[in-house]
Each structure stands twice: as C-alpha cells, then as structure tokens.
From Swiss-Prot:
Pfam families registered for this protein in UniProt: Homeodomain
Naturally occurring in which organism (per UniProt): Myxine glutinosa (Atlantic hagfish)
Entry's transmembrane regions: none
Keywords from the named record: Developmental protein, DNA-binding, Homeobox, Nucleus
Family: Belongs to the engrailed homeobox family.
Cellular component terms per the entry's GO annotation: nucleus
Keyword Magnesium (UniProt): no
InterPro entries assigned: Engrailed_Homeobox_TFs, HD, HD_metazoa, Homeobox_CS, Homeodomain-like_sf, HTH_motif
Name of the protein in its database record: Homeobox protein engrailed-like A
Phylogenetic placement of the source organism: Eukaryota, Metazoa, Chordata, Craniata, Vertebrata
C-alpha cells in the first residue's frame, strides 16, 4: 500500500520519469526498474484510454 501511494504521488508530480528518478524510486520501494517503468506506462495508458483520446495515426 505504501509503494502504491508513493508511485501515485510521483505520478501526480510527473507523468514521465528520468532514468535517474526511476532508479531512485526502484531502490526506495525495493522494486526493479522495469516494474516502475511498466507501472508508469500502464498508468499513462489508462488515463489516455479513459479520456477517449484516439490514436489517429492508427487509421493510416
């Protein structure tokens, strides 16, 4: 629960992480960098999907 709260707080502050920030978060939360990266990717995708934004490039 603390990990999730920390990830959400970080996401609120910045939707995209630098490599250094990702490494620090991984260390702080005892997760690996890939887990942090995927969590952020999924969170961005979820918000994009919920907002109804469509990828117009996919049509061509």
């Amino acid at each position: 629960a603390d990990q999730l709260a920390r990830l959400r707080a970080e996401f609120q502050a910045n939707r995209y992480l630098t490599e250094e920030r990702r490494q620090n978060l991984a260390r702080e939360l005892s997760l690996n960098e890939a887990q942090i990266k995927i969590w952020f990717q999924n969170k961005r995708a979820k918000i994009k999907k919920a907002s109804g934004v469509k990828n117009t490039l996919a049509l061509y």
